[in-house]
Structure formats: C-alpha cells, structure tokens
Amino acid sequence: MVYNEIGKTGMKVANLAFGASSLGGVFHDLREEEGIRAVHTAVDNGINFIDVSPYYGHLKAEMVLGKALKEIARDRYYLSTKVGRYGKDGVNTWDYSAQRATDSVYESMQRLNVDFIDLINVHDIEFADLQQVVDETLPALVALKKKGVVGHVGITDLQPENLKWVIEHSPEGTVESVLCFCHYSLNDDMLVDYLDFFEAHGVGVINASPLSMGLLSQRGTPPWHPAPDPLKEACKRAADFCTEKGYPIEKLAIQFATSLNPRIATTLFSSTNSDNVLKNIRFVDEEMDRQLVEEVQRIIGDQMRVRWKNS
C-alpha cells in the first residue's frame, strides 16, 4: 500500500481504508468477535483509516468498533464518523440541526471509546436541506473543531454535485474532505470530473464502495440494489468475463479504485472477515491488469456512469 494525505489535513492514510458499515450487520448477520478480529487484522497490516457512522446498523457498528478500538493504541489509526443520518428500531431518521450534530459527536465518542474524532462528516447530505448544512450543521462541527473535540470536518454523499454545491456556498476551508461512493469504480468514474474543483479548494477526496455496493461481484448483485436492470446485467457480464479469465472482478475493482488516481487519497472497503481483509490488501499490492480494465469497461459499454438514487 501507499500512503497519501487527505487534502491538507496532515492525515497520511493508506490507499485502502476500513469501512465499518459491515460491523453493524448491514450486509449479513454479524458475529461480533469476527468483526473485532477484522478491525485488528486491518490495523496490524497497515490500514490506518477507519470510517463508521451511527447510522450503520443503527448504532451497532459504532459499538462493535468501539470494542475493537479498546485494544488498539490511539496513535495507530485515524477515526472518522458522521452526523445527520440515524436510525432506531429499523426506522431511518435524519436530523441535520446544530444541536443534534453536536450531541451526536459526543454520543459517538462514548460508543467508540475515544475522546477525539479525527474526521467528522455530515452524512449523506442529499437527504438534507443543503442550505441548512451550510448554515447550521457545518458551523456546529467547526465549533467542535475549535474546542479540540474533532480534528477535521468533511461531508459525504452519493451525488458529487451536492458536495460541490456545499463547498461553493461555505466559507473557504470549512469543508476539508469529501467522501463519495460508487463514483470511482470500474463501472463509474464520474468522480474524476470533480477532482480539479476539490483540489482547487484544498479538499481531500475519499472514495468508497469500490465494488459499487455489490454490482462488481462474482456472487451477483444483491436483490436490494437500486441500480437499473441494464446496469446490473452489464456488470454481471463483466464479472463472468473476469471469472473466465481467472481474475476475480473484485480484485480488479479494488485495484482500479486504489491505483489509478493519486488525488483520491484512499478507498474504503468493508468486511467482517479477516481473510477478506488480508486478500484485499494483497490485491492492492499486486500490479493491475490494465488491458482487462479496458475489456471490462467495453463490456459495460453504454451503462458506464449510469446512476441511481440513494436510499
């Protein structure tokens, strides 16, 4: 792995990062001890950036991650969590008010067993009034930064144009990083179109979901996936082609996301399986088959950059 700085934050992170959504049992049933072991495996093998949210598993991911972090020295990792999107008893909720954002940070720290958050993000801003994010949510987080409770402030969303709008309408330097998912992967590289803008504003870029939420998988797209059917079918053809070549599409997708653009500081993946963690790290360290990338993208064809709504 290589280590890149997230914007101007001073945080130098491995180009592969651990996303803790799976610790909430988001994708399948979770055995806590396996999830904790996966976190330890990631950190022990060079991954030093961990991202989570109170939304993942409706608090469960933060609680399980907190148990894992108890056993890891605080100077071995950077920790990122979020405010704005929540859930309880299986019902999703959103609250981007200043008071809720402030309270949420302290609640997250308690669950995570830490007294400092390196990066705090406004989560999935497309569900918010973007003007409220600018006028209320972000100033609340900046106030916590001034108090030394958090180190840096960012925003996250599926739609990169929303990230751009909030940066344009906020005081310069307010937003220090963006996290965008499913837009720098084999089937969608739209994030590249925004990198000049982010760089011009000193904003670091974090990529997430290199497998496009399961589109790029030998197992096939999960039934809940919101992508349109033609895109699902194109990605299935691409995955089958990679299997025939003896080169799993998951491997190619991880390599694509982590190796081609140094302006993207890191890419998040999520797993509760220690063997998968080690496998993904090995993928990053191996040379990518660039010709196969071209062949896969030809198969995806007119479904490249096809989008879907967040949910």
Predicted regions and their residues:
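Active-site mouth loops of central-metabolism enzymes
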Residues: 21-33, 88-99, 128-129
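Conserved, mostly hydrophobic/aromatic
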Residues: 6, 18, 35, 50, ...
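Short, well-ordered coil/turn segments that N-cap beta-strands
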Residues: 11-16, 46-48, 73-77, 114-118, ...
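Acidic (Asp/Glu)-rich catalytic clusters
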Residues: 8, 44, 68-75, 109-113, ...
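Beta/alpha (TIM)-barrel catalytic core signal, keyed to glycine-rich beta->alpha loops juxtaposed to Asp/Glu
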Residues: 125-310
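Active-site groove signature of glycoside hydrolases
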Residues: 109-128
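Short, acidic/polar
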Residues: 29-42, 97-112, 159-167
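N-terminal binding-site loop/beta-alpha segment at the start of enzyme catalytic domains
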Residues: 1-77, 146
